[in-house]
């Protein structure tokens, strides 16, 4: 019975994560982590590591698809990615020292903020509007946003994709499809770094 429950939960978690990543640039950890914790009673820290590992392939496939349709900003994405990777390790280290309840509450708060943002201020930016932003401004914002996203991705996993989308559209002025494409491109590498550092610090499940 337990094996059947595990298979069913994993199938639903995988399906939800795939749809969320491909359609909205959401981290797979936003779906997988709470399902593993709630139904399979896996420790939150371990669940985040598993979810981030699942995120690697899902994000890579989504990024390839968005890239083929020219909805991917690789230049600024690479700058942001390097900063994100550095702070992902820091976030993973801090999360191992923080109580599980705090991690869960932070994840819920980030999801709530993202939902409110898109309801109050929908993304109406076009690709033409994006081109008007000075190159230097983009680089500075990429570094700052990368540091924030990297820490959050390593800390709770679920916040990585959602926060990245929030910052790309709200702070950096990205058009929505390009924001999603760039987000999943960066998440491919943050998820890989996050999962490896999680298991290196906390041990493999």
Enumerate the language-model features and the residues they cover.
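Juxtamembrane transmembrane-helix boundary motif
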Residues: 1-19, 31-39, 44, 64-155, ...
């Amino acid at each position: 019975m337990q094996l059947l429950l595990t298979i069913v939960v994993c199938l639903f978690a995988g399906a939800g994560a795939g749809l969320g990543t491909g359609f909205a640039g959401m981290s797979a950890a936003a779906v997988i982590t709470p399902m593993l914790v709630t139904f399979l009673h896996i420790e939150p820290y371990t669940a985040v590591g598993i979810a981030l590992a699942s995120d690697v392939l899902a994000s890579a496939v989504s990024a390839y698809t968005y890239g083929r349709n020219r909805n991917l900003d690789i230049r600024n994405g690479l700058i942001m990615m390097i900063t994100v990777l550095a702070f992902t390790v820091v976030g993973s280290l801090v999360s191992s020292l923080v109580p599980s309840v705090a991690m869960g509450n932070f994840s819920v708060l980030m999801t709530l903020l993202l939902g409110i943002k898109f309801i109050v201020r929908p993304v109406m930016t076009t690709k033409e509007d994006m081109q008007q932003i000075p190159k230097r401004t983009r680089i500075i914002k990429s570094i700052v946003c990368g540091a924030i996203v990297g820490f959050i991705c390593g800390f709770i996993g679920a916040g990585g994709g959602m926060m990245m989308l929030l910052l790309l559209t709200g702070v950096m002025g990205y058009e929505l499809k390009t924001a999603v494409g760039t987000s999943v491109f960066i998440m491919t590498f943050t998820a890989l770094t996050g999962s490896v550092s999680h298991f290196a610090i906390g041990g493999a499940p």
